[in-house]
């Protein structure tokens, strides 16, 4: 709670002035919007969704003040991603479509493609979305050809393709797509997202029954999440490790992994998630 209050106070410092902006201040607004966007995305990657919304609400507000279409689109996409993670899918879809309309209106074909990729991911991860997997895979593959300048969005598109391949039961192709995403994240030192790539690769390997290699992938995810102190990622990695070890028949290692996950969740004040991890021990 104290962290949230401090964050609100820091946002209020930017929000209180209502005087007209001087011409030179527009560049300061852009810098502040970019800073809020970076922090919002980082908070989201660490599972701090409520804090992420505070940063991203401010990023959207500052982007509106600059009237910079590209900045407005990127801030809108990130905010919609968090809304989707919070279960507010209707608002998320509305936000993605607003960003898409902005991109189309300004003639930005690349950012329009980026918006469509996010919309496709939303379809795929919605209830019953697996029936659309082939259509989503084809749509994202077409849009990927239009994304040239932003490596982060290219990596994201490959991840969505991988998820679609997973839903189609093509686990080797799913991992190949995630490897394309992983290669970008590792080269760009984006270790939080590299950890998530390994987490997904582990899930693909587990689904295919290769529990030994799934464990290796989770060990890589844990190493990256430790490197960036992503406690949320670590808790999920260890819970997944418990699942994999249980499927492999190693009950002792499974229990240890679930217990470790629960300890991290509890340290994050996520008692429900901690209870879920412990409940899997004897399930």
Tell me the role of every PLM-derived stretch.
Residues 251-269:
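TPR/TPR-like (Sel1-like) alpha-helical repeat modules
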Residues 16-70, 74:
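N-terminal leader/linker segments that initiate helical-solenoid repeat arrays
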Residues 36, 43, 55, 62, ...:
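TPR/Sel1-like alpha-solenoid repeat signature
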Residues 47, 87, 127-128, 169, ...:
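Residue-level detector of the short coil/turn that links helix A to helix B
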Residues 1-14:
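Sec-dependent bacterial lipoprotein signal peptides
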Residues 24-27, 64-68, 104-108, 146-150, ...:
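Short coil/turn linkers that connect adjacent helices within long alpha-helical scaffolds
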Residues 52, 92, 132-136, 174, ...:
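Single-residue signature of alpha-solenoid repeat helices
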Residues 95, 99, 130-144:
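Alpha-helical repeat scaffolds
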């Amino acid at each position: 709670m104290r962290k949230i209050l401090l964050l609100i106070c820091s946002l209020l410092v930017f929000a209180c002035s209502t005087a007209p902006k001087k011409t030179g201040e527009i560049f300061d607004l852009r810098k502040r919007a970019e800073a809020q966007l970076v922090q919002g995305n980082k908070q989201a990657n660490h599972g701090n969704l409520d804090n992420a919304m505070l940063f991203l609400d401010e990023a959207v507000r500052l982007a509106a003040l600059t009237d910079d279409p590209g900045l407005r689109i990127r801030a809108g996409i990130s905010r919609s991603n968090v809304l989707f993670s919070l279960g507010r899918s209707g608002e998320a879809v509305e936000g993605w479509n607003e960003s898409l309309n902005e991109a189309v209106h300004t003639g930005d074909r690349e950012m329009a493609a980026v918006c469509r990729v996010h919309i496709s991911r939303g379809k795929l991860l919605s209830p019953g979305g697996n029936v659309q997997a082939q259509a989503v895979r084809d749509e994202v593959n077409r849009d990927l050809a239009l994304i040239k300048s932003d490596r982060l969005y290219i990596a994201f598109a490959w991840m969505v393709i991988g998820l679609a391949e997973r839903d189609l039961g093509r686990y080797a192709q799913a991992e190949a797509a995630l490897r394309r995403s992983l290669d970008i994240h590792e080269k760009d030192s984006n270790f939080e997202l590299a950890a998530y790539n390994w987490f997904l690769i582990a899930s693909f390997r587990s689904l295919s029954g290769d529990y030994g290699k799934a464990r290796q992938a989770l060990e890589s995810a844990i190493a990256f999440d430790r490197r960036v102190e992503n406690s949320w990622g670590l808790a999920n990695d260890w819970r997944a490790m418990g699942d994999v070890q249980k499927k492999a028949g190693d009950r002792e290692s499974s229990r240890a992994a679930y217990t470790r996950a629960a300890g991290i969740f509890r340290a994050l004040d996520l008692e429900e998630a901690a209870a879920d991890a412990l409940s899997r021990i004897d399930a």
